[in-house]
A protein has these predicted regions:
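Conserved FAD-binding catalytic core of PHBH/FMO-like flavoproteins
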Residues: 128-174, 179
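Beta1-alpha1 glycine-rich phosphate/pyrophosphate-binding loop at the start
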Residues: 6-63, 158-186
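A conserved FAD-binding loop/helix module that cradles the flavin
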Residues: 21-22, 165-169, 291-330
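Eukaryotic N-terminal targeting leaders
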Residues: 1-5, 329-330
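A Rossmann-like FAD-binding core segment of flavoenzymes
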Residues: 63-91, 95-98, 175-273, 320-330
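FAD-binding core/adjacent interface of flavoenzyme oxidoreductases
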Residues: 3-6, 76-148, 269-271, 275-279
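FAD-site-proximal beta/loop scaffold in flavoenzymes
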Residues: 127-144, 246-300, 310, 317
């Protein structure tokens, strides 16, 4: 038996991984939390919808969580490492290896690796992401309430009527006028225009089919006067308080593929999430669990915390049943 064998290997140090570690500690399980310091909200100054941590810095949230875990619980360890390889050794053990060749073994594996956003090829998009381009108007946008204008980028997987209208309706809660940018997609423009005309909604919503050639920030994320400039192919520019776009995503890291895990169906080839059903979030391989952004299209901190807890409770249930030779709960 390897000297560095632990009960659970947790890959990912965001809210899901941190919650999984804390949950396992409460039942005296040994676990290692692997963190490569790469986070989806790393470009954001604030996080929301977390009681006691609403409109506060996500980096400080992670630091405070680490302090609580590693100050109070001796069975959890932290490794600042990027895991490059994961494999199932046998029915009882998993082995992971980092990019420097160091390896660890565990009885259970929790993947909380997060997801990778696939940005559209619009100049300036990456710089504005998380600052003036919002993927979720529950997470961002409230601070811009009563804005004169906001825009929807109806591109990528949002280039359809249901998603474009859903995002526009959310934006209309916060802005007086909402423009849906269809970026040269004439069929989508016509469909949206017909719906808006039929509903008599032209005073709030409008459609702009001009091709977007770039976006740029005005001000910074900490200023209530910040905005985003939309550059269009005809040379004109439009200033919006914020843009809404939920980019396509793919599972971050290749570990799920290496393990042969099933992925949830996706409309866009090469994108999607790890298939892991509630409430236990076990994947297609027994003993491997997924938590956080890597296993759901609803990528918010509150959801990551919830799934991290559930995955850890499920891993614990299997570990304890195996320890005592009992029939497992699942």
């Amino acid at each position: 038996m390897p000297a560095d064998l632990v009960d659970v290997l947790i890959i990912g140090g965001g809210p899901a991984g941190l919650t999984a570690a804390l949950t396992l500690a409460r039942q005296l399980h040994t676990a290692i939390l692997f963190d490569n310091q790469s986070y989806r909200n790393g470009n954001s100054s604030f996080m929301h919808m977390i009681p006691t941590w609403d409109h506060k810095d996500p980096a400080q949230f992670r630091e405070k969580a680490r302090q609580e875990i590693f100050s109070n619980y001796s069975t959890i360890r932290l490794e600042n490492a990027t895991i490059a390889k994961a494999e199932k050794k046998d029915d009882a053990l998993f082995k992971i290896t980092d990019e420097n060749g160091s390896s660890w073994e565990g009885r259970k594996l929790i993947l909380a690796t997060g997801s990778q956003d696939i940005f559209p090829p619009i100049p300036g998009y990456a710089d504005a992401w998380g600052k003036r381009i919002f993927h979720c108007l529950f997470c961002k946008g409230y601070e811009d309430r009563s804005a004169k204008r906001a825009g929807i980028l109806a591109i990528q997987s949002a280039a359809n009527v249901p998603m474009a209208m859903h995002q526009a309706e959310n934006a209309a809660q916060l802005a007086e006028q909402v423009t849906i940018y269809t970026n040269g997609q004439e069929a989508l423009e016509s469909q949206l225009a017909a719906i808006l005309a039929d509903k008599g909604s032209k005073t709030v919503f409008k459609v702009d089919n001009r091709v977007i050639t770039g976006v740029s920030l005005n001000g910074d994320d900490l200023s209530n006067k910040a905005s985003v400039q939309v550059q269009l192919a005809d040379g004109s520019q439009v200033e919006e308080a914020f843009l809404v776009h939920n980019p396509d995503t793919q599972v971050k890291s290749t570990l799920a593929t290496q393990l042969g895990l099933d992925l949830a169906p996706s409309f866009v080839p090469g994108t999607g999430d790890i298939a892991a059903a509630a409430p236990f979030y076990q994947t297609s391989i027994r003993g491997v669990f997924a938590a956080g952004d890597c296993m759901t299209p609803y990528k918010v901190v509150a959801g990551a915390i919830s799934s991290g807890c559930n995955a850890a409770v499920a891993a614990s249930a299997q570990l304890l049943a195996e320890k005592h030779g009992h029939q497992p709960l699942f």
